[in-house]
C-alpha cells in the first residue's frame, strides 16, 4: 500500500507542475512594446502599430509627459468619437504599462484636442 500512496503523490506533483508550466507559459512569450518608440506616446500615432504582431498578454509601455497627456483605455466607440466612455480606465503616471487582451484594444489621450490630433491607437492582439 505504501508504494501505491507514493505513486499517487508523485502523480499529483507532476500534475501540479504541469499546471504551473501551462499557467506561466503564456507570459514567457509575452513582449513589451514602447508605444511610439523613442518618441513615446504623442500625436499622429496611427502608423506606429503597423508591421508589429501583437499577442494577448503583451505589454504596451506608454511614456509621456504626464502634465500634458494621459492614456485612456476605451472601446471602439470611444476610439472613433474621441469621447471617453463612462468607467473607462485612465492612466496618468507618464510611464504606464498596459497588458493587451485578446482582440481589439483601443487607447486615446482624452486631453482636449489630443485624440482628434491623432493621439490614439488601435491594436489587434491575437
What are these regions (language model features)?
Residues 2-16, 21-41, 67-69, 80-126:
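Extracellular/periplasmic metallocenter environments
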Residues 41-50:
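Short alpha-helix capping/helix-loop boundary micro-motifs
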Residues 51-52, 62:
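Short secondary-structure boundary/capping segments within folded domains
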Residues 60-80:
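N-terminal V-set
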Amino acid at each position: 500500500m505504501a508504494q501505491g500512496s507514493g505513486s499517487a503523490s508523485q502523480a499529483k506533483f507532476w500534475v501540479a507542475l504541469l499546471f504551473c508550466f501551462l499557467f506561466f507559459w503564456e507570459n514567457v512569450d509575452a513582449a513589451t512594446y514602447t508605444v511610439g518608440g523613442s518618441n513615446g506616446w504623442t500625436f499622429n500615432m496611427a502608423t506606429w502599430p503597423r508591421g508589429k504582431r501583437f499577442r494577448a498578454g503583451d505589454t504596451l509601455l506608454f511614456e509621456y509627459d504626464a502634465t500634458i497627456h494621459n492614456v485612456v483605455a476605451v472601446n471602439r466607440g470611444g476610439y472613433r468619437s474621441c469621447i471617453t466612455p463612462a468607467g473607462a480606465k485612465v492612466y496618468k503616471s507618464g510611464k504606464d504599462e498596459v497588458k493587451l487582451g485578446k482582440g481589439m484594444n483601443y487607447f486615446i489621450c482624452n486631453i482636449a484636442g489630443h485624440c482628434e490630433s491623432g493621439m490614439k491607437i488601435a491594436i489587434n492582439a491575437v
